[in-house]
């Protein structure tokens, strides 16, 4: 009888903890430590605080958002918990940075992309490995995975110790146009989210990856303010539409131009 009571009390504590944990996040959960080997954190030397994410696409190149550009950027790879550091964490600085437009003049609606060449290549390890560029664009309705260390509250800037992951859907571009009146008629972006709200990327997540069916399809760009509002999905730079530019830069053609 005593054992039954003890087990019942433990179950109640577990349920209570689970409920409180779910109330602390914008629709996400802690990522599995093995599912984000390509996810990198961007921070500045002075702040030491993650302001953006990025995606490792080979041992020497990281793809992020133009809005994430800063002076004295540091790139941390192999991170999971900010409290318990993985043994294979590596830190790099940029050798070169390329954007379609200057980070000061890019439009909020388009061309939010930055390619970073690392000063020193990284070594693949238990928690570090690149992700492949997409072979095809994502299909409408695809279930995609977003991840990052962005704020876990829509009203107060509170960052988690570990990256959070959540599933969202690729939506028709017209859904984003209906939500944001200033969007152009066409754009090289993806509209993605949950129409009911409650699940969204937020401050600190820009530059991170949108993974659809195992392929790197989007770069977190911007969304509603406050985050996770119903019928106001997020905007993601469409990686597939920028493949030629990305591959040309990596191949050494540093004067390559982005798609119009």
From Swiss-Prot:
Keywords: Disulfide bond, Glycoprotein, Hemostasis impairing toxin, Secreted, Serine protease homolog, Signal, Toxin, Zymogen. It is found in: Secreted. GO terms for cellular component: extracellular region; secretory granule. Disulfide bonds join 31-165, 52-68, 100-258, 144-212, 176-191, 202-227. GO terms for biological process: proteolysis. Residues 25-251 form the Peptidase S1 domain. It comes from the Eukaryota. InterPro entries: Peptidase_S1_PA, Peptidase_S1_PA_chymotrypsin, Peptidase_S1A, Trypsin_dom. The keyword Acyltransferase does not apply. Expressed by the venom gland. Residues 19-24 form a propeptide. Residues 1-18 form the signal peptide. PANTHER family: KALLIKREIN-1, KALLIKREIN-RELATED. Snake venom serine protease homolog that may act in the hemostasis system of the prey. This is Snake venom serine protease homolog. It comes from Protobothrops jerdonii (Jerdon's pitviper). The lineage of its organism: Eukaryota, Metazoa, Chordata, Craniata, Vertebrata.
